[in-house]
C-alpha cells in the first residue's frame, strides 16, 4: 500500500475535527485491511475502464487484481459510464473539456505538505468537477457535510485542482461528486 500524506485528503474528516489525531495516526503502522485492498483493486479497474472509454491505451489489469469479480466489473462499468456522461454534459458548453484520471493534486498552499490523488477530475472552461469513487458498502459517504459545507476529502482535491488549473480554466463552478455504486449513491 502506498504511503499517505501526513494530512491526507482521505483522513481530512478526522484531522479537521481533531488536529492532534494526525500526529497520533502517523505513529501507527499503516496496514491495509482486506476491504482497503479490495477498494484499491476496484480503483485500479475503474481507472482502466475510464481510460478505455476515453479511447486511451490502458493495459487490462484484471489478471493482477486479487479481489476482482463480476460485481466489481459491473460497478466499474457503471462508473466509467457515469464519468463519460458527466464529460458529455460539460462538452455541451466546452468541446475541449478534459478528464484526468488518478491525478495528483497539491493543496499545500492551505495544508502543510498537503497532497493526494483524485480519482477523476473533469475540467472545462468554467467548471471543475471532482468525482470520487467509493467501492465500500459499509459506510454511506456524502458529498456534502453540515459541519464543513462539503466533503472534506473532495474539498482538499478541489483546492489542489484549483491551485493547478484555475489560471487556465477560470472556474466559476466546483462540483464534488461521490460515486458509491454498492450503496446506490
Put a short name on every predicted segment:
Residues 37, 95-185:
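Mg2+/Mn2+-dependent nuclease catalytic core
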Residues 1-127, 175:
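Metal-dependent nuclease catalytic cores that hydrolyze phosphodiester bonds in DNA/RNA
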Amino acid at each position: 500500500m502506498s504511503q499517505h500524506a501526513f494530512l491526507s485528503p482521505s483522513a481530512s474528516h478526522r484531522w479537521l475535527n481533531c488536529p492532534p489525531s494526525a500526529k497520533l495516526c502517523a505513529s501507527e503502522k499503516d496496514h491495509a485491511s482486506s476491504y482497503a485492498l479490495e477498494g484499491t483493486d476496484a480503483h485500479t479497474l475503474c481507472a482502466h475502464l475510464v481510460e478505455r472509454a476515453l479511447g486511451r491505451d490502458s493495459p487490462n489489469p484484471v489478471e493482477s487484481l486479487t479481489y476482482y469479480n463480476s460485481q466489481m466489473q459491473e460497478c466499474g462499468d457503471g462508473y466509467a459510464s457515469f464519468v463519460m456522461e458527466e464529460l458529455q454534459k460539460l462538452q455541451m458548453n466546452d468541446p475541449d473539456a478534459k478528464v484526468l484520471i488518478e491525478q495528483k493534486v497539491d493543496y499545500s498552499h492551505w495544508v502543510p505538505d498537503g497532497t493526494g490523488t483524485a480519482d477523476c477530475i473533469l475540467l472545462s472552461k468554467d467548471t471543475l468537477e471532482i468525482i470520487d469513487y467509493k467501492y465500500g458498502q459499509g459506510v454511506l459517504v456524502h458529498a456534502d457535510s453540515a459541519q464543513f459545507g462539503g466533503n472534506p476529502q473532495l474539498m482538499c482535491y478541489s483546492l489542489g485542482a484549483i491551485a493547478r488549473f484555475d489560471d487556465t480554466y477560470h472556474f466559476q463552478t466546483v462540483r464534488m461528486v461521490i460515486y458509491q455504486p454498492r450503496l446506490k449513491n
